Amino acid sequence: CIRIVDNDIVSLSNLQRQILFKEEDVGKKKVIAAKKNLLDLNSHLNIETFDEQFNEKSSRQLIDNCDILIDGTDNFKSKSSICKIAFKKTIPLVYGGLSQWEGQVCVFDPKSASICFGCIFPNDPGQEFEDSCLNFGIIGPTVGVIGSLMAAEVIKFLTSCGKPIINKILTYDCLQGEFQEFA
């Protein structure tokens, strides 16, 4: 089962970087549009949607029986909160972060004594960082690369194939065409 949690509405500015949505989805709830578009791709999917914000209180019902969490949020506070919840519930988390031309991916696995979001990012960068993303945007192809890497990490983790990016962070610089790994 795939669970999608979001309390946002599709906006025109989402379309250049969120390829799950189409122009006809603008103004619709993201969870409803996401479910419809995913089922259009594969009608055999089992998808549950929750039109609410993911937080400590709502997480109780949302993550029961989940094998893995995928963080697709766009702000520091949410990312930090999701990681804390994942560690509290001992559920692996695939993290992806973006800023303009750069992105990063990491798998946090509480069962393997892995690093956590707070270990890598101990300080909230503050509103200035959030504003820079809002003002300068995020480049669509960078989102595609990071999203694909996150999907690969989910598959590797769930199937025990390959070596997930645990206890390190993989960064991608779209402008330079370079990947770097930090342990």
List the model feature ranges, each with a label.
Residues 1-183:
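Adenine nucleotide-associated cytosolic modules
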